[in-house]
Regions:
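Active-site and adjacent loop segments of nucleotide-processing enzymes
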Residues: 51, 135-208, 308-466
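N-terminal regions immediately upstream of nucleotidyltransferase
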Residues: 1-45, 151-218, 439, 456-479, ...
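Compositionally biased low-complexity segments enriched in polar/charged residues
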Residues: 55-63, 67-68, 78-82, 132, ...
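Charge-rich, solvent-exposed alpha-helical interaction surfaces
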Residues: 17, 21, 46, 103, ...
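Amphipathic alpha-helical segments
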Residues: 93-107, 265-281
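Active-site nucleotide-donor binding segment shared across nucleotidyl transfer reactions
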Residues: 40-94, 98-99, 216-265
Length: 558
């Protein structure tokens, strides 16, 4: 250090000093600046009381802090000087926005404003220019079935559901990797305290009784292997990991029950595939489905005699990380043949995320018998990844087929800020409010009645909203103000009906020797029950509890 160093503190010393000084400043701000600590606490109490009464499901940083500190107090990352906003899901966020603003106004607070946030379908409430909460739209059929823990009377989204958000971040290098520094440690601690089930028994799926289905699935794979912008995930990726490790023991090849793949050109590829796949058999049909929450976009399911054989998803303006590999044909567990062709399979992180998402989907569809399969699939991915890394003396961040944090990805990306900007421009052209905003003392701001896009994941029954047709209605199922809607067009009608999807419920697969055919009439009756379900995953329940359903798999005790 020279004699003329103006700042003579070393970097390691600075980090300690800065942290301590920052806490001092936070306390002084709460004591000396407006809004003060008393006002902040009053507003928080009102927001939390409302969230409790409405049984809204909390997510985000506030929720992560709750679940971590609930199990281990020193894992809390917020302290008494922090004022984090409270994020929660709601099937009617605009109703909540108005109600909360009115309550706060009645309590005498000033400068109350509710308005759209920077990311779509999310709304913020400010009091005295400070942000206190954000509410995000979640379709009712998803909302009613999202698992949660109840902590201090609050419904906190279940840690296993939170994991999806982490993997969405990991698999979104373009837009989300800047969040790593803050979230990585949180996820590691969440994984420590609320681990996914560790399963000792291997994944096994028996062959279809109709051996022709295997042949059809193999033929569909041949068609898909010729497309350059398709990324495979799910059971095909699992078998490829088995092939990669040459493992024939506990994690052996499985009979692939159906194919799952994503594309960044959903309509173009979808139209081509309908034509090409339909030529394979006159017994092949298909159905289109709405996006499923924030998790994936429009999708199409191909069926062979009513049995799902291929799930085809839109990338939903996300860039999907992938690895290019040799195309290996897995017609059944014994007929495995490598080719010289190349295909793309999802990165390890993407495959885990997809399985976690489908766990939510089968819960929404009240088809929890698939839980066992999906948890075993996740365990298989992890075990095979670890085996491959051990065989090749690699780390998970080293470049390999099973690597994490993959930057190579497929798809055009659009940021949430750009989406909101384009939405504002579209509204202005229609002479509509640029931003949905509500202030209790301005009645003119009350006059909005907004219809959210259908993201229920249900089948598209309104022909005007089909995407895989010659001339699709591009604006169908866009968010809109009610007076924009055509009188003869009810785009969201499927969202409030009983979920009658046949995409997963009709899977005729044997697992552990049990025939998994489902009776359609029984499914409809079950759906009437499930849409009224609001069950909590309390700690007194088994770790594998899923509402009333207890899965069959065995857990290794930790």
């Amino acid at each position: 250090m020279s004699n003329f160093d103006v700042i003579d503190i070393e970097e390691d010393e600075f980090n300690t000093i800065y942290s301590d000084k920052l806490e001092e400043i936070k306390k002084k701000k709460l004591e000396n600046m407006e809004p003060g600590i008393n006002e902040i606490k009053r507003v928080y109490d009102i927001v939390l009381k409302y969230v409790k009464e409405k049984k809204r499901k909390i997510y985000g940083g506030y929720a992560w802090n709750k679940v971590l500190s609930h199990k281990k107090k020193d894992y809390a990352f917020y302290n008494e000087t922090d004022t984090p906003d409270i994020d929660f899901y709601s099937p009617e966020p605009l109703v909540d926005l108005v109600n909360l603003c009115d309550i706060l106004h009645a309590e005498g607070f000033k400068y109350i404003k509710g308005q759209e946030a920077r990311h779509g379908e999310t709304y913020s409430i400010f009091v005295n220019f400070q942000l206190y909460c954000e509410m995000s739209y979640m379709p009712k059929n998803v909302y009613n079935n999202v698992r949660f823990l109840q902590i201090d009377g609050l419904n906190i989204t279940h840690p296993w559901f939170m994991m999806i958000d982490f993997f969405r971040m990991v698999t979104d290098p373009m837009l989300s990797w800047w969040r790593f520094e803050k979230h990585f440690q949180r996820y590691k601690r969440l994984q420590e305290l609320y681990p996914l089930p560790k399963i000792s028994s291997p994944l096994t799926i028996e062959r279809y009784e109709d051996k022709g289905i295997e042949k059809i699935i193999s033929n569909v794979m041949d068609v898909l292997s010729t497309k350059n912008n398709i990324v495979f995930t799910g059971f095909y990726a699992y078998n490829y990991y088995v092939y990669l490790t040459k493992e024939r023991g506990n994690n052996k090849y499985i009979n692939i029950p159906y194919i799952e793949a994503y594309t960044d050109e959903y309509r173009e590829n979808g139209m081509e595939l309908i034509d090409e796949i339909s030529k394979l058999s006159d017994k092949i049909t298909y159905k289109e489905f709405y996006p499923f929450f924030q998790f994936y976009g429009y999708n199409c399911v191909f069926y062979y005699e009513g049995i799902p054989i291929f799930y085809f998803y839109s990338s939903n303006e996300r860039c999907i990380p992938y690895k290019t590999v040799d195309y290996v044909k897995f017609e059944n567990t014994k007929n495995v043949k490598a080719t010289k062709d190349k295909i793309k399979i999802g990165s390890f992180d993407f495959n885990i995320m997809q399985a976690l998402i489908i766990l939510v989907k089968v819960r929404v569809d009240d088809d929890t018998e698939w839980n066992d399969v999906l948890y075993k699939l996740i365990n298989g991915f992890v075990n095979l990844r670890n085996l491959y890394l051990k065989q090749n003396k690699l780390k998970s961040y080293d470049d390999s087929v099973v690597a994490s944090f993959v930057t190579q990805c497929l798809g055009k990306v659009i940021s949430s800020e750009r989406k909101v900007g384009l939405l504002i421009m579209s509204r202005l052209k229609k002479k509509k409010p640029a931003i949905i905003r509500y202030t209790p003392d301005k009645e003119s701001s009350n006059n909005f009645n907004y219809i959210f896009p259908n993201s229920s994941g249900n089948q598209i029954k309104n022909e005007k909203c089909l995407k895989l047709v010659e001339t699709p209605n591009k604006s169908c199922n866009d968010g809109k103000f009610k007076d924009d809607e055509d009188e003869d067009e009810d785009e969201n009608k499927d969202e409030d009906e009983d979920n009658e999807n046949e995409d997963i419920k009709n899977k005729k697969i044997k697992i552990k020797g049990k025939n998994k055919n489902n009776n359609k009439n029984n499914n409809k009756n079950n759906n009437n029950k499930k849409n009224n379900k609001e069950d909590s995953d309390n700690e007194s329940e088994s770790i594998i509890s899923d509402g009333e359903y207890i899965s069959e798999y065995e857990l290794d005790e930790k």
